[in-house]
Amino acid sequence: MAALYASRRIAQHGVKEHCMKVLVYDTHSYDQTFLNAANQGQHQLDYTPAQLDLQTAALAQGYDAVCLFVNDIASAEVLERLAEGGVRMIAQRSTGYNNIDLDAARRLGITCMRVSYYSPYSVAEHAVALLMTLNRRIHRAFNRTREFNFRLAGLMGRDINGSTVGVVGTGKIGTIFAKIMQGFGCTVLAYDVRENPECIAMGVRYVPLDDLLAASDIVSLHVPLFPETHHMINRESLARMKRRAYLINTSRGGLVDADALIKAIESGHLAGVGLDVYEEEQGKFFRDLSDRPMPDDVLARLISFPNVLVTGHQAYFTEEAVTTISETTIRNLSDFAAGRTNENTL
């Protein structure tokens, strides 16, 4: 395929081949820092803090491509607006892409590319951090000691060593999480539609999901969000979980039915819950809402529990991961502009 874009002149860098005009949605200062470092002036990157939706699609008028993040909405109607404005490529700067209507994108001739790999260690390690913080009540101890309260009542945890850990999804992240938990001396069970030979070689035992839930002291979710996995953790599956188990979700918020989860927490069925994602996080996560009432009663209720720890989709957020995400995004833009596909093309 011939190169799609003529060269443009960028003042401080001279003429660059296949330069694209790109609008980067949902950006913060750190996004700009890392993307600019990766870009090296090759493409014209314009930034907006706005998230993509039907109203903000007009901002992309006249752009060759848009760069999106997990909470940007690229529905069929939004994609039609983008296509009308000249957009022919979406650079998704994440692994997940359930926010993009791929069928509509293909129909409209919009190529979509993602970051298929960055640092699986970042997410796996954050899942462990959530677990350990919950189990040893670190968040509660931190708040106490800041007020010079050094009492231990209410801070008792459990040994992780000897626990049974259920890993739901054994891709790169799930496999690394399993390795870490084996290092703690845990027995690791797994569920996935495809068994990973690496996990089998490690001694991980694959079992049906119901068996995993019933046997595990800790359940950690590492699967993508598809119609088949939506609300896979629901009233029935929560009831099957071992009493006083921990549930960790660093994958996608839609995997968990939040209303059912609240009932399981209120009943005392779960020892604790660590969430880095939330089904209705769009418009809330990545934003400072500290000066206004929380607009989501379900999220507010979850945060109010002393044995629930919520972080704002930060599991991926390490220097190494953001560097790789930025470099891969720029490579995707450059390959598309030069008429090439790569392993990240959806």
Regions found by a protein language model. Name each.
Residues 108-164, 176-179, 183:
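Phosphate-binding beta-alpha-beta segment of Rossmann-like dinucleotide-binding domains, i.e.
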Residues 60-65, 85-87, 214-219, 242-245:
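Short acidic/histidine-rich motifs immediately flanking catalytic phosphotransfer sites
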Residues 244, 252-346:
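Rossmann-like dinucleotide-binding domain for NAD(H)/NADP(H)
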Residues 69, 93-94, 110-121, 210, ...:
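Short beta->alpha connector loops at strand-helix junctions that form conserved
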Residues 153-243:
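Rossmann-like dinucleotide/phosphate-binding beta-alpha-beta segment
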Residues 70-71, 217, 223-225, 251-252, ...:
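Short glycine-/small-residue-rich Rossmann-like dinucleotide-binding loops
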Residues 5-19:
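Short, Lys/Arg-enriched N-terminal segments with co-localized hydrophobic residues
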Residues 21-112, 234:
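An N-terminal-biased, well-structured beta-alpha scaffold segment characteristic
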